[in-house]
Amino acid sequence: MKILLTAINAKYIHSNLAVYSLKASSGRYRDDVEIAEYTINNYIDEILSSIYIKKPDLIAFSCYIWNIDMVLELIDLFHKVAGDVPVWVGGPEVSYDARAVLEKNPGITGVMCGEGEATFRELLACYEETFGGDLRAGNVMDFWKRLEQVQGLVFRSWDQTIVATGERPPLAMDDLPFPYEDLKAFDHKIIYYETSRGCPFSCSY
């Protein structure tokens, strides 16, 4: 199974911590996960072509205020050329009202809400354990039942109903692996690293 984590950054010098952290935490699926980073200055057809050539079995987008319009347009175009490839999204721009995002965007399979490292790994396990390497084979109903057990998801089920699996408890930061494999690959770029998450005053983010 080939999984593509996609980030559209504001500038070329930026990197997306979220996708690197998801890959680092993906466990036995790590070698199946590829990261693709673009910028909002890339032509949308250029990004679409690059993604299509990679032939992902599953694609996930990291969504922020600066890229959400571009991401949603890309998802619509991607389905026109690639068919029914599962598309998942995450990030602050979609997780605060995931149900509304799914209602407005039929091309999105589901939203990963909150801290995504464990959620993403368990999501991949649902796909791999149900379908193996071929997402066109396997017991579809069994897949949806498995998915309902993964905390931190809001998704469109087989009958088009929207299912929310509930919040995942905060992760212990000390348990998360270092997200960057090769720091030399980030020469002349800005990288980000978290030492804490959330707000001590219980702000919504």
Question: What is the meaning of each model-derived region?
Answer:
Residues T6, V89-P92, T195-S196:
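Short hydrophobic "strand-cap" motifs at the C-terminus of beta-strands
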Residues I13, P170-D175:
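A short local loop/turn or secondary-structure capping micro-motif enriched for an aromatic residue
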Residues Y12, W66, Y96, V101, ...:
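Tryptophan-centric aromatic hotspots in well-structured domains and transmembrane helices
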Residues K2, A18, S25, D32-P169:
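Glycine-rich beta-alpha loop elements in corrinoid/cobalamin-binding modules
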Residues M1-K2, H188:
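A short, charged/proline- and glycine-enriched loop
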Residues K2-K11:
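Nucleotide-activated donor-dependent transferases that construct or modify glycoconjugates
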Residues Y12-A18:
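Short N-terminal binding/cap micro-motifs at the start of the first secondary-structure element
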Residues D174-Y205:
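Radical SAM [4Fe-4S] cluster-binding motif and immediate context
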